[in-house]
Amino acid sequence: MFNFRNLPLFDKDNSKDTDDIKNFINSYEGIYFSSSNKFINVFLDKILIIDPSSLNVITINTDLYVVDFLFNEKNKNLIVLGKGKNSLICSVYNIRECNFTLLKKIQLSKNINNIKKTLIAKCNEYIITLENKKITFYFLNKDYSINQSELIEDGKELIENIYLSKNHILLVIKNSYVYIYQLDIKNSHISYTLIDSFNLNLSYLRESINNKKKHINKINDVSNNDPKKDNNEKNTSSNNITHNNYNDISNNNNNNNNINGVKDHINNNTLENNDEPILSIYNEDLNVLYICQNMYNVLFVLNLNNLSFEFILLENKIINLFSCKFYLILLKEVNKKFFLHIYIIYEDMKLLVSTLLLNEPISNVIFFNNLFCLLIEEEISKPEIKVDKFYFYEQLKLKLHSKLDGDALKILKRDHVTNNINICKQEEKKYKLKNEQKDVEIYNKNNTVDSTNNTIYNSEVNHYKYITNDFFLNEDVNTDIKKELYNLNHTKDNINHDTLKKQTNQNDITMSLSKDEKNNDTNKFFNENMFTLNKFFKNCRNQIKIILKERNINEIINMFKKKKLYQWLIKYANLNKNYQIININFIHKIYADFLFEKEQYENAIYEYIQTINYLETSYVIHKYLNLDLYEYLTIYLEKLHVYHHFNDEHTMMLLSCYKKQCKKKKMISFIKKNKDKINLNKTYKFLLNAGYYNIVLNLSKKYKDHFTYVSILIEKYENYEKSLKYIFKLDVENICILLFKYGYKFIKYYPQLTIYLLKKIIKKYNINLTIFIPLFLDNIDFLFMFIVKFLDKNVNINKINHIQEKQKHHYSNMYHDSDELNSVTKQKNKINSFLLYEKDNNQNHNGIPSDSHNLSDDNNSQESTTAVNLINKTNLQLDIFNGEYDYILFVTVIQILLQKYKKSMQEENQTNNQSSKQTNNQSSKQTNKQSINQSNNQSINQTNNQSIKQTNIQTNKQKGNSTTNKIINKDETNEQNNILTFNIDKLIQNNKDKNINFLSVLLLSIYNYNKGLIYTSTQMNKYDISLLFSIHKFINNTKGKINKINMDEHKPNEQTMQINSSYKILNRNFQKVIYNICINHLKLNGSLSYNYIFYYLSMLNDEKYLIKFIKKIRQDMNLSIFNLIQILKKYNKSYSCIQNMVVAYMNDMNKNINDKCIEIEKDKKELEKIKKKQLKKKYNFYLIDNAYCSICKEILSVPMIHFLCKHSYHSYCLKDNNVCILCHNKDKEKKLLKEKAINSIQNFDEFFKYLQGSTDKFSYISNYLSYGITPK
C-alpha cells in the first residue's frame, strides 16, 4: 500500500485557442487518435488524416470495416487492418503531403469471429492477433508477403489481453498471471522466449500482505525500544520522498486492524465481483503496464525497465483506464457520478495530479500540444446521425449490408466500456430504474466502507465525506462531490420508498416489451468478444467537451519546491523533457543547494555533477574551497575531466587536492588515464614545483616526452653526459630540437663528445652541417674546428710535422736569453695543442672514437688553442659550394676568418702605437739632456764624450733587444695575416655565384677588408663600390704616410723644410690620384655616379680639378646650370668655378625673352580680331537657308525652331528638347570616348597591351591625345 501526495498540476482550459482546436476536431465525426502532430479520424470504413497546422485532410476509403491501424513517420506508411465479410485484411498505404497510394492488400485470416485484439509493430514489420488461447504472428517481408507463426497456450485460462512494448517484448495477460515474452526476428520468422511471469492471485496478495505485516511490526518494535531514533526519523530531511510523516502508521494495534481490514476488503469484493473483467493499459513513455483487477479491487503496476512488480488496493470499482504521456487516468463511478483521477505512478514516485467530477463517462483521451482532450460519451437521442461532407452515410449502408450481417451493425452501436446497448428511449427508462435501485445499495455499502476505512487509517473524517481509500486522499475530492453525497444522505429514506414503486413498474415495463426487442436482446451477444480489446467502436459527433491543460512549468517547479520533493521534481522533469522545454540542470542546481545547506555535502556534489554543462564551475569550487572540503571537490573535478568540460586550471586544482590529501598513487593513475586530455607540460611544472622530480622523470620517459626528461636531467641534476647519450638515441627531429635548446651547454662542458656525436648523426641521416651552426655561436673556435673536420681536404699529418720542425728550428736559433726561452715555451705549448687536435682528427678518420668522457678543463683549454691555431696556421681547401645551404656555410667560414683578421690588425696597430710612443719619449728625453749639458758645461764636453758614447751604446743595446722582440711579434702577426688573407682571397676567388658575391661584399664592407671588396665589386660590375673602397684604400695609405712624417717632427729645425716639401708633394699626388680614379670610374660607369665624384672632388683644396670635371660632364650630360648650382650647394662650394657658364646662360636667356615678347604681341592682335567676330554674331542677322527638317527630312512649317549650328526642326519633332539633338548626340559620343580613354589610361596594363598590339602605334597615341587627355 502506498501513500500518494497531492499536487494539482492540471487546470481546465477555456481559452480561444483551445476552443478553436476543440471545434475543429469536433467537426469531424468518428474516433480520434493523435500521432505526433497529426490526428487520424476513423469512421467505419474511412480514415481521415488531419494536419491541424496546414488544415490538410487526406481521406482514405478502405472498403473495409476498420479494426486497427498504425502510421510510421519514418517511411510514411500506414498499415490498416479491416474486416471484410469473415476475413481479416491488411492494407498498406504510402502517405505523402496531399496524396496516398495503396501498396498492397493482404488477407491475414479467413475466420475473424474469435479474434479479440490486433497489434501492429511500430517498425511496420509484423502484426499480432489474439484469439482465446492462441496468438498469431504475421511477418511482413519487403515484398509484402507474409510468414506466419503461432503461440498456443495449453492452460485452462483464456488470454485477457496482449501488449507489445519496447524492444519487441510481448506482454500476455491472463486472469491470474502476466507472462513476458521476448520476440526474436530471424530470417523473416518470429520466435519467442519466456522471460518472466507474475502472479495475480488472491493467495499471493495475502502472503505479500503478511510479509508487510511482519516488517511493520519489526519497525514498530525498534521504534518503541529506541525513542531517540524515532525522534531523529521525524526530523529527517524531506528529500526521503517515499515516506511521509503525516501518513505514517503509529501503533501496532492499528497495523493489525489495517491488515485485517484489507483481508475483509478483498473477501467482500471477491464475492461481489467474481465476473468482473481485467482492465489494463500500457504506457509507452514509462514502459509500464497497469492492470486493474476489479475482482480484488487491486491495481497492479509492472515496470518493464527493471521488471519490478507492485500492487495498490482500491476502494471503488474502476470503469476504464487511459494513459497519456506518463500519466495514468482512472475513471470511477460512485453514486451515479463519474470521477476522473490522474496519477503519476512510476518507481517510488506516487502523485495524484488531478481529480475531476463528470456527469458522463469518458470513451477516450486525446493528447495534443500539451492538451488533454476528454471524449465524453453521449447517448444518441435520435437514430439519425448527421454526417460530414467527407462521408455519405447512405452509400455506406448499402456497402455494409452487402458485406456484413445485420447483427454486425448492432455491434457498431455498442459501448466499449459498459457493453450496454442503447436501442431506444424505453430501454433508457428501464435501465434508469434499475440503476437507481442499485445506487441505493451502493450508497449503503459505501457508508459501511467509510466506517471501516476510518478504523483502518485513523482518519477523523466525517461520515458525509467521500473517502478515497484506495489512495488515501481526503483532500482531493471536489466540493461538488461533497454536495451530491450530502444531498443523497438526506434523501436516503425517500429513495428507499421510491425504489419499491420503481421495482413494480419495472416488471410491468418488461412484460410490455415487444417480440422484436426480445429478438434484438438475444442477438446482442453475437460476436461480443470480437475486437473488444481494441476499443474502437464509438462514432459520435461533438464528443470533446472538456480540455485539461498542464500548468506552467515554473508553477510546477515551485509546487515541488515548496513541498521539498526535489527527487520527484527531477524525475518529473526527465519524464516531461520530450514534451516541454525544461531546464533540468536548474532543478539539479536547486536540489544541490538545498542539500549543501543541510550539510549533506556528498549528495550535493553528485547533484552539482549533473549541472556541469549548465552551472559555472567556479560557483561549486568556491563553495567547497571555503569549507576546505577537498575530498568532495576531487570528485567534482574528476567528473569535469570525464565529461571533457575542464581547463588547465581545473587540472592544477585537482592535482593540488591530491597533494593536500597525500594521494600520490591516485595522482599518478589520474595522469596515466588522462594523458591525452590534459596539458602535460603544465602538470609537469606543477609536479616539479611540488618537488616530485622522480615522478616527472619516470612519466616523461614512459610517455616519451623527451623535452621534459632532458630538461630535468640538465637543469635539476646537471647530468650532461647521460642526457647526451639519451638524446642521440632518439630520432632526427627530437635530436635537433633538443640540441638547439641545450647544445650550447653540451659544447661548453663536453665539446669533443658533442662534435663526435654530431658527426655520427650527420653521416647517418645525411643532414646538412649548417643546421648545427647556431650551436657554436658562443664559441667560434669550436665552430671552425667542427666545419674543418667535415670540409677540409688538406688536413695531413706530414705537413703539420714539417711546419712544427721549421718553427722549432727557427725559434731555437733566435733566442738564448730567459725572455727568449719563455717565448719559445709558449710556442711549444701551441704546437702541442695543435698536435692534440690532429691526433683526434686522425682517430676519427680511422674510425676510432676518442675517449672524451673524462676530459678535464685543461683539455678543454687545449682544444680551444687547437682551434685558434687551425684558423691561423693552415691553408684551407674547403668544399663549400656543393650543398643546399652553401650560402650559410660560406658566410660562417668567411665571417670567422674576417673576425680573426680584424683582431690581428687591431693588435698590430696597438703595438705600433705603443712602440712609437716609447721611442718618441726616449728620444725627447735624450735631446733635452744633451741640450742642457751643452749650455751649462761646454768646457767639459771633451771629458764626457766617452760617457756619452757608453750611454749611446747601452741605449742601442736596449733598442736591439726591443727590436728583436718586435721583429718576432711582427713575424708572427705577418704570418698570421698572410695566412688569413690567403684563405679569405681563396674563398672569394673560388666563388662563382652572384648571391654569394653579394653576401661577400656585405661582409667585407663590415670588416673593412678593402682588397676583397675591390675584387668582388669589379666582378659584379658594381663600379660604385669599387670607387668608394679604392678611394678609401688610397686615403688610408696616405694617412699612414702622414703618420710617418709626423713621427719626424721632433727632429731639429733643419729638417722642417724637408717635411713641408714632403707634405706638399703628398698633397699634389693625392689630388692627382683621386682625380684620375674618378675619371676612370666615369669612363667605366658612365655619368650615373657623378654625385660620388662631385663629393670627392669637392673635398680637394684645388678647384681646377672640379672645373675640369664640370666642363666634361656638361659636354657629355648636358646638365643645366641650376642642377650644377644645387650640387655645389650640397658640398658648400663657391660659384666662382661656374661664373663664366652662368654669364653665358644669362645672355641666352635675354635673347629668348625678346623673342617671346614679339610672339605675345602677335597673339594679342589675333585675340582682338576674334572678339570682333563674336560681337558681329551677337548683333548681326543670320541667313537661314534650311528648307527641310533635320530629323524628319520634310518641308519646314510653322512653328519651327532654328539653331546657330545651322540645324532646323519642327517644334513637334523636338518635343520638349531645347537642345539640338544631332549636336547633342555628337557631344555625348565624345564624352563617352573621353571617359573610356581616361579609364584605359588609368589602367596602364591595358594601355600598353593595345599599344603593342596596334600596327600603327603613333596613330593609337594620337587618338588619345585628340580627346584632350594626358596621363597624370
Curated annotation (Swiss-Prot):
CHCR repeats: 608-752
TM regions (residue ranges): 771-791
Subcellular location: Membrane
Signal peptide (UniProt feature, chain positions): none
Gene Ontology process terms (BP): endosome organization; intracellular protein transport; organelle fusion; vacuole organization; vesicle docking involved in exocytosis; vesicle-mediated transport
Biased composition (Low complexity): 234-260, 850-861, 909-956
Zinc finger (RING-type): 1189-1224
Keyword terms: Coiled coil, Membrane, Merozoite, Metal-binding, Transmembrane, Transmembrane helix, Zinc, Zinc-finger
Its membrane topology: Single-pass membrane protein
Chief location bin: membrane
Extent of Polar residues compositional bias: 957-967
Applied value in biotechnology: Possible candidate for an effective malaria vaccine as determined by epitope response in sera.
MF-aspect GO terms: protein-macromolecule adaptor activity; zinc ion binding
Coiled-coil regions listed: 1146-1182
InterPro entries: Clathrin_H-chain/VPS_repeat, VPS11_C, Znf_RING, Znf_RING/FYVE/PHD
Keyword set includes Protease: no
Pfam families assigned to the protein according to its UniProt record, in alphabetical order: VPS11_C
Recorded GO CC terms: endosome; HOPS complex; membrane
Protein name: RING finger protein PFE0100w
Organism: Plasmodium falciparum (isolate 3D7)
Lineage: Eukaryota, Sar, Alveolata, Apicomplexa, Aconoidasida
